[in-house]
Amino acid sequence: MFSEHLAWSSHDGVYFNDLLPLPYNAETLDCVIRHIDEVQHTLNTRLLLENPSTYVSFGASDMDEVEFLRAIAGRTGCGLLLDVNNVYVSSVNHGFDAAAYIDRFPVELVGEIHLAGFAEDQDADAGRLLIDAHGAPVADAVWSLYRRTLARSGPIPTLIEWDNDVPDFAKVVAEVSLARVILVEEATRRNRRRAA
C-alpha cells in the first residue's frame, strides 16, 4: 500500500517546499484521474489518496473536497487516506464545519487514518491560521473528529505523525495509546449498536 496527497508541488520545472491545493473542478478532476490511473497501472497496486491541509482555495472550484475525492475514487478505484488533522486545520482556515465534512466523507473507501498536531499562527488579516506542522500533540478537537469517524467506519489502521519538535518517547507512546483506546471504545460502541 502507498499513499499520496491530493496536492501539487511543482510547475514548469520549479519545485515548491509545500503541498499546494488544487482547484476542485472538472478539468482538474480529469487530470488527477489520468495521473492516478497511470500510477496504479505502472505500480500494479492501489493508491490511497490523502486529503490535504489547505491555507488558500481557488475561486475556480465548483465542487467541494469531499465531492472531488469521492469522484476520483469512483473513477479510478483508488482508496482514500483520511487525515483527520488536515480536516480540522482546513476547517478552521476556511470556516467550514469539520464534523459535517467527516459525516459526508466516504469512510468505506478509507484504508488508513492519520492524526497529528498543528501549529497556530495569524493570517494577513490577524485571523486564526492553523498549520499542519506535525510538531505537537493531537488536539482535543481532532480526537473528537477521530471518534466521530470511527463511529461511522469501524476500526481503521491509524498513524500518528510527529516529525518536528519530537518529544521524548513516552509522550509519543501516550498519543498512540490514546488512539488505541479510542479505536477500541468506538469499535465496542459500534458493535453494541449493531447488536441492538
Write out the residue ranges for each language-model feature.
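C-terminal helical cap(s) of enzyme catalytic domains, especially alpha/beta-barrels
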Residues: 169-192
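Gly/Pro-rich active-site loop or hairpin
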Residues: 20-23, 29, 95-153
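Distinct, well-ordered alpha-helical segments
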Residues: 58-74, 90-103, 170-172
